């Protein structure tokens, strides 16, 4: 059969890939659902089942209406194997969504230390003044009673259950400019969380944020199974 011929062709190639792969290296094999289960058996034999890492689902296209008797095929599989334990792997993160940026990071800080809320137009356009930093604020109150963390800081009273941080940590955060002080002593000190210091959500084994190449894309070279640069970048950055 065509599948047997394909697997017979793939087996020696996978063995050679395993041979030349560095001890810290990994293999990512892209395949569609018609062959992924057969290829996994081959890879388990070549790499060892203990070196299987993930079966990544890549959502490469949106749902279409040409499938009448089954669910439309919108995803492919990427089988991820390591050469052996100790392979290089770097956790990947998604970029922040527009909703996260709009709803959570609504303050700006300027080089002179002044801060203000973003305007409606700035939130809608996501265009902010040069050299400004976006941040949001986090409560510094302890969720549980902490008698040892009930102290006044720079004239500001502690929250009812105490601070979340020790006095030494408060001083360090203050030196780093990460405390936002209220206009009056009746307010509460807040922690500044800068956008440029926050990673997005951790990427899991279902990738929905990388679309397939379209004919209008500049990077398209005409190769039928060409992969998007964003897909290759994620794999390279991860391993």
Give short role names for the model-derived ranges.
Residues 1-239:
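Core catalytic lobe of class I
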């Amino acid at each position: 059969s065509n599948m047997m011929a394909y697997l017979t062709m793939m087996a020696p190639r996978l063995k050679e890939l395993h041979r030349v792969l560095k001890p810290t290296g990994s293999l990512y094999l892209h395949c569609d659902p018609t062959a992924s289960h057969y290829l996994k058996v081959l890879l388990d034999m070549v790499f060892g089942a203990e070196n299987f890492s993930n079966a990544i689902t890549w959502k490469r296209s949106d749902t279409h209406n040409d499938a009448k008797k089954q669910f439309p095929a919108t995803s492919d599989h990427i089988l991820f194997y390591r050469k052996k334990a100790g392979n290089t792997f770097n956790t990947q993160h998604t970029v922040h969504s527009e909703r996260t940026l709009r709803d959570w990071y609504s303050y700006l800080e300027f080089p002179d230390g002044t801060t203000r809320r973003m305007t409606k137009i700035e939130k809608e356009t996501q265009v902010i003044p040069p050299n400004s930093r976006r941040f949001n604020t986090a409560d510094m109150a302890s969720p549980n009673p902490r008698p040892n963390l009930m102290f006044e800081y720079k004239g500001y009273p502690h929250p009812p259950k105490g601070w979340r941080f020790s006095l030494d940590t408060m001083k360090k955060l203050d030196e780093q400019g990460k405390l936002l002080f209220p206009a009056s002593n009746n307010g509460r000190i807040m922690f500044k969380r800068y956008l440029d210091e926050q990673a997005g959500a951790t990427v899991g084994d279902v990738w929905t944020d990388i679309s397939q190449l379209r004919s209008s894309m500049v990077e398209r070279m005409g190769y039928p199974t060409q992969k998007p640069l964003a897909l290759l970048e994620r794999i390279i950055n991860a391993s």
